[in-house]
């Protein structure tokens, strides 16, 4: 192999330069031309070269910077000539089509790739066409063939790629190197580092990304890069997006703004992909280049062709990254606008990278003495970027650790809501989940100790609590003996249990088994079970049965209600057991429900909605901070509390009509008052477009919308959390404060509350009411307050009914207090 390279300042001096080149005879001659000349002038140069060397194969592309013997030169033409002794060449040109794989097949077919093909050098007319599939070439045996090269750079004289004596546009030109004696080595260097936070792809169409984290991607790029609306192309490609871990270097290059909106990328991202901005500084590759130079020297490479990214010149003001390669072998090449790299068995399209193709003809010689390589230059840039990279890594680790701690704490809190604190059994929440999958041949029994209140009053709460644990063990033993692995036991109240089990038994047989168990249990003296101070303690049980075959279409709540109603019926009629299927619909209950529906309907028609307000006070000072506005209806002079009618009308058309009247009355009374106030929104309100439009108009009518708070009850009735979050975010933009109500109640989906990002969270009264007596409840409340602080939300303690509860709540760090101790609801005048 013989190699020589020359610089040509201009076309006029080309003849003089060519006369100085005396080429030896060889099997093949490859002339690579890298030049800022126009298409017409470079064709003249090509014809001049072919007139002197008609057998030569010419290949090249437009550029403004070339690499000549390891040095960077600007605005000159480089001729790089290689004479091969044992290698033959093939050439190809392929116009682009929409089928990238088909383009690759045509390119491989024209190049006649075989098992003797060692490498391909290819230049593409435009960076946008650098798609991996277009350059993933294989020989006739299906083995991959490395492809090096890149995309032509736009110059003031135009952009072109050259093959022999013709320039091409919208095409790729290539030559293939074939020869058993030819050894090639490929490599590349890039050090893309993720910068900043992680974004999630939330809207994408093909190769266009429209939104990250539900925000237009153009706005995110403009904000982070400090760019104008047009987003310069150089800026875009300098900051691609990285998916996954840094070590994978999985990059997505923004190609430009799309007319349809969004940014177009070199390959498509998927919905929900997580990405980060990344940035590369070429000085980070220097150490790796020096290591590669040592390896190439050991392989006795005779020629190195470098295809470098033009953007690297913005950072590499010297030729440090080229010096070690030039010390190994003559190093020539050009600066491209995108680079092709074959590494680790895969063809890749690189950006912001330096790639090389090193060659040798013949075997390694033992008599050659290696030339010492230059010393590695010391500098501060590489250590600085390493420090920045590790700082980001440490920050990510801290964030992950904090997230794990919050998840662990949340799991503990969530688990405490799913377990009964007295018995340790799964509670009503878990039972409801189980009943959601109530299947054939399954049965539900609701069970209660009917004399438990008397036991508590006579023997005290410690004795009662111990009895609950002992009874739970007795029930579990019975179930394990009779229905091993086919039953579950749940605590659904104080002295109340439920069991779900599978058995091919009818109601009569189940009644018989239960009766025998009750007869046996009621004659047990529980003194041996840890009650030494009790001479004799007996219990009385009753139960209600629901079988799936009788109530196949009922919801979990209805199933449990049916079982409890059957149990109550048994107790009221002095029985141990009642099958819900035997109960007839109680006409009085139905009539009462119809009566309430009639009264509410009458109140809505007459617009007899009454607004009450209860103060919410600042902790410590007890100054009124706002009012919670509460609905009442007036019927024939009687003020009716919502607990009497809301449960009945929840699933009817009356509910949304009542909500809109409540909104109207509340805003009419509060519009000209100075105090802040809040109203309650149910899941039905959040799903009603008419109610939401009515509420929006009311908020806009207030001079200061920041006075308005919207209390959202986060419950299992919410089916579409995305819609709820969307609605709340909309009202937040109008100025309203988003408040989560009853947090910590039997149902709280903490993940969704985190996504909702409320400004205020109200702790459920069931947690606060007994914190002066129940230490465990107090600890749970304390943890919830801390969790709210992590979420950057203010907290309100509800049901503050005495001074002790008030003081404890303040000590826990709540921001506001609400309850009878501070003020009862009163009618707004």
Curated annotation (Swiss-Prot):
InterPro entries: Cyclic-di-GMP_PDE-like, EAL_dom, EAL_sf, FIST_C, FIST_domain_N, GGDEF_dom, Nucleotide_cyclase, Rev_trsase/Diguanyl_cyclase. SMART domains: EAL, FIST, FIST_C, GGDEF. CDD domains: EAL (cd01948). Residues 593-829 form the EAL domain. Gene3D superfamilies: 3.30.70.270, EAL domain (3.20.20.450). It catalyses: 3',3'-c-di-GMP + H2O = 5'-phosphoguanylyl(3'->5')guanosine + H(+). GO terms for biological process: regulation of single-species biofilm formation. Pfam families: EAL, FIST, FIST_C, GGDEF. GO terms for cellular component: plasma membrane. SUPFAM superfamilies: EAL domain-like, Nucleotide cyclase. The keyword Magnesium applies. It is an enzyme of class 3 (hydrolase). Disruption phenotype: Cells lacking this gene have a level of c-di-GMP almost four-fold higher than that of the respective parent strain. Disruption of this gene also results in increased biofilm formation. PROSITE patterns: EAL (PS50883). PANTHER family: CYCLIC DI-GMP PHOSPHODIESTERASE PDED-RELATED, CYCLIC DI-GMP PHOSPHODIESTERASE PDEF. Phosphodiesterase (PDE) that catalyzes the hydrolysis of cyclic diguanylate (c-di-GMP). Is involved in the modulation of intracellular c-di-GMP levels. Cyclic-di-GMP is a second messenger which positively regulates biofilm formation and negatively regulates virulence in V.cholerae, and is proposed to play an important role in the transition from persistence in the environment to survival in the host. CdpA functions as a repressor of biofilm formation but has no effect on colonization of the infant mouse small intestine. The EAL domain is required for c-di-GMP PDE activity, and the degenerate GGDEF domain is required for full PDE activity of the EAL domain. The GG(D/E)EF motif in CdpA is degenerate, having the sequence GVGEW. This is Cyclic di-GMP phosphodiesterase CdpA. It comes from Vibrio cholerae serotype O1 (strain ATCC 39315 / El Tor Inaba N16961). The gene is cdpA.
């Amino acid at each position: 192999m013989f190699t020589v390279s020359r610089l040509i300042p201009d076309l006029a001096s080309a003849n003089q330069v060519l006369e100085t080149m005396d080429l030896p005879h060889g099997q093949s001659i490859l002339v690579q031309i890298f030049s800022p000349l126009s298409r017409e002038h470079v064709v003249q140069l090509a014809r001049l070269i072919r007139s002197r060397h008609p057998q030569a194969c010419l290949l090249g592309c437009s550029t403004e910077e070339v690499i000549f013997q390891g040095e960077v030169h600007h605005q000159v033409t480089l001729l790089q000539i290689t004479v091969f002794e044992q290698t033959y060449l093939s050439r190809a040109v392929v116009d682009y089509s929409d089928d990238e794989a088909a383009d690759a097949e045509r390119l491989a077919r024209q190049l006649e790739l075989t098992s003797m093909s060692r490498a391909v050098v290819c230049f593409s007319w435009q960076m946008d066409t650098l798609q991996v599939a277009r350059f993933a070439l294989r020989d006739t045996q299906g083995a991959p063939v490395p492809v090096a090269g890149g995309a032509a750079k736009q110059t003031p004289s135009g952009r072109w790629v050259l093959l022999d004596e013709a320039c091409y546009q919208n095409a790729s030109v290539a030559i293939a190197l074939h020869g058993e004696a030819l050894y090639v080595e490929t490599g590349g260097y890039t050090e893309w580092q993720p910068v900043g936070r992680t974004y999630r792809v939330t809207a994408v169409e093909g190769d266009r990304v429209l939104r990250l984290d539900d925000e237009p991607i153009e706005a995110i790029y403009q904000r982070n890069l400090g760019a104008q609306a047009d987003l310069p192309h150089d800026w875009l490609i300098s900051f691609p997006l990285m998916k996954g871990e840094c070590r994978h270097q999985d990059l997505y290059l923004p190609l430009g703004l799309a007319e349809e909106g969004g940014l177009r990328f070199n390959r498509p991202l998927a919905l929900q992909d997580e990405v980060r901005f990344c940035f590369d500084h070429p000085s980070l590759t220097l150490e790796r280049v020096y290591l590669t130079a040592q390896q190439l020297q050991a392989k006795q490479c005779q020629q190195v062709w470098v295809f470098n990214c033009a953007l690297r010149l913005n950072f590499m003001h010297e030729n440090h990254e080229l010096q070690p390669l030039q010390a190994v072998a003559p190093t020539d090449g050009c600066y491209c606008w995108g680079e092709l790299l074959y590494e680790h068995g895969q063809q890749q399209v690189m950006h912001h990278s330096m790639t090389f193709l090193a060659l040798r003809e013949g075997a390694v010689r033992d008599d050659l003495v290696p030339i010492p390589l230059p010393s590695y230059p010391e500098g501060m840039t590489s250590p600085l970027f390493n420090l920045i990279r590790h700082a980001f890594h440490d920050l990510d680790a801290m964030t992950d650790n904090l997230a794990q701690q919050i998840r662990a704490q949340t799991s503990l809190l969530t688990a405490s809501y799913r377990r009964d604190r007295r018995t340790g059994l799964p509670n009503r929440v878990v039972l409801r989940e189980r009943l959601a999958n109530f299947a054939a041949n399954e049965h539900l029994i609701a069970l209660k100790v009917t004399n438990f209140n008397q036991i508590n009053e006579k023997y005290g709460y410690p004795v009662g609590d111990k009895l609950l644990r002992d009874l739970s063990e007795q029930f579990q033993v019975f179930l394990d003996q009779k229905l091993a692995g086919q039953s579950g036991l749940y605590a659904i109240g104080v002295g109340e249990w439920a069991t779900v089990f599978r058995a091919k038994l009818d109601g009569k047989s189940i009644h018989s088994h239960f009766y025998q168990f009750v007869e046996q249990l009621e004659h047990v003296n529980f003194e041996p079970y840890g009650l030494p101070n009790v001479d004799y303690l007996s219990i009385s049980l009753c139960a209600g049965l629901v079988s799936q075959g009788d109530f196949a279409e009922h919801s979990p709540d209805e199933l449990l209600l049916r079982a409890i109603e059957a149990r109550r019926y048994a107790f009221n009629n002095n029985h141990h057991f009642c099958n819900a299927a035997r109960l007839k619909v109680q006409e009085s209950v139905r009539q009462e429900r119809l009566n309430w529906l009639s009264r509410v309907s009458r109140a809505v028609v007459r617009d007899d909605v009454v607004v009450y307000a209860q103060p919410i006070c600042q902790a410590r000072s007890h100054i009124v901070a706002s009012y919670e506005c509460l609905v009442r209806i007036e019927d024939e002079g009687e003020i009716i509390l919502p607990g009497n009618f809301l449960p009945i009308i929840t699933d009817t058309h009356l509910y949304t009509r009542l909500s809109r009247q409540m909104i109207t009355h509340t805003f009419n009374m509060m519009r000209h008052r100075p105090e802040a106030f809040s109203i309650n929104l149910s899941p039905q309100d959040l799903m009603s477009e008419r109610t939401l439009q009515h509420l929006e108009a009311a908020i806009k009518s207030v001079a200061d919308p920041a006075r308005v708070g919207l209390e959202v009850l986060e419950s299992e009735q919410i089916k579409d959390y995305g819609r709820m979050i969307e609605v709340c975010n909309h009202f937040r933009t109008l100025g309203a404060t988003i408040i989560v109500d009853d947090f910590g109640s039997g149902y709280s989906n903490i993940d969704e509350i985190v996504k909702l990002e409320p400004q205020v969270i109200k702790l459920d009264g069931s947690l606060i009411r007994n914190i002066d007596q129940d230490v465990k409840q107090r600890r749970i409340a304390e943890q919830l307050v801390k969790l709210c602080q992590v979420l950057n939300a203010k907290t309100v303690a509800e049901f503050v009914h005495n001074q002790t509860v008030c003081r404890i709540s303040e000590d826990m760090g709540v921001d506001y207090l609400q309850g009878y101790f501070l003020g009862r609801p009163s009618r707004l005048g």
